[in-house]
Amino acid sequence: MIGFAPVSTPDAAAEAAARARQDSLTKPRGALGSLEDLSVWVASCQQRCPPRQFERARVVVFAGDHGVARSGVSAYPPEVTAQMVANIDAGGAAINALADVAGATVRVADLAVDADPLSERIGAHKVRRGSGNIATEDALTNDETAAAITAGQQIADEEVDAGADLLIAGDMGIGNTTAAAVLVAALTDAEPVAVVGFGTGIDDAGWARKTAAVRDALFRVRPVLPDPVGLLRCAGGADLAAIAGFCAQAAVRRTPLLLDGVAVTAAALVAERLAPGAHRWWQAGHRSSEPGHGLALAALGLDPIVDLHMRLGEGTGAAVALMVLRAAVAALSSMATFTEAGVSTRSVDGVDRTAPPAVSP
């Protein structure tokens, strides 16, 4: 049986202390813009002010193939998924390069790649070889859906138990943006043309095929709404179902998480329904150029940290955002207050602003 423990809220006392400390630092109030809000969020997640710099940031890339990819909805053949899993494991993918400079390590997990697992470690949570063609059939069976969601829960637990203090969800799978578009359209009541983008670089004919596949899948999923598990069974696939479980369980475990592009954020939309309130533990790493991503972010009430017109997936946008998040933590933790630095404050209300006391767990 699929179930998640209740999601608690980030710590309000640490949030208030962090906001007060931001206002006491040697700068005009609000001068660091969104960095201030991000630092306050980290403090509330860590239950301490000032917050600690992240020591074990971890990227998990969830890999899986989608039967709909054989309908001409991608510019790349399905076998690229297995090849890219090997590339990520070898350290040669974009996510490896960006995670390295961001101070994070990378794990790839095969949930439904249409090939034998590259290794026992990578395939430890494999559910099946490839997910069904969602335009004509369910992506998964009931048991497979439960297994995939549980796999995501277990992977989150494994990472948190091993000491991860920030998680990034990434994706790898030819055809996964088609499945993601269905999830977003179903949960935001959007038309297929509003959520379908050009993915890996398809042409206009490919876009038309992709839109038709999303339309057909939406017709199939309407009867199961608003059931999130039923939606994942019909149209998600094992990789997206696992991402949903991962994002939900990260929140249950009070661990901050950065979302990546449209595939991850679509799964997060479902995760919010599996574990209400989970979104408070997430930040949107970036805004993808995929049109459905903006709709999904709006539905979650999340603003992207960066907007660099990226559309790769893998966790790359979130890895870039991690560098910004680290800067936010550093500013709140390392800057001096007006009192500490002996710097005069701007006199507005005649009140001398001093640093608030530290808050520890």
Swiss-Prot record:
- InterPro entries from the UniProt entry: Nict_dMeBzImd_PRibTrfase, Nict_dMeBzImd_PRibTrfase_bact, Nict_dMeBzImd_PRibTrfase_N, Nict_dMeBzImd_PRibTrfase_sf
MF terms from GO for this chain are: nicotinate-nucleotide-dimethylbenzimidazole phosphoribosyltransferase activity
Q: Does Coiled coil appear among the keywords?
A: no
Q: What does the record give as the reaction this protein catalyses?
A: 5,6-dimethylbenzimidazole + nicotinate beta-D-ribonucleotide = alpha-ribazole 5'-phosphate + nicotinate + H(+)
What keywords does the record list, in alphabetical order? Answer: Cobalamin biosynthesis, Glycosyltransferase, Transferase
Q: Which GO terms describe its biological process?
A: cobalamin biosynthetic process
SUPFAM superfamilies found in the cross-reference section = Nicotinate mononucleotide:5,6-dimethylbenzimidazole phosphoribosyltransferase (CobT) (SSF52733)
Kindly identify the residues recorded as the active site.
Answer: E314
The role this protein plays is: Catalyzes the synthesis of alpha-ribazole-5'-phosphate from nicotinate mononucleotide (NAMN) and 5,6-dimethylbenzimidazole (DMB).
Tell me which HAMAP family the record gives. Answer: CobT
Q: Which family does it belong to?
A: Belongs to the CobT family.
State what protein this is by name: Nicotinate-nucleotide--dimethylbenzimidazole phosphoribosyltransferase
The species this protein belongs to is: Mycobacterium tuberculosis (strain ATCC 25177 / H37Ra)
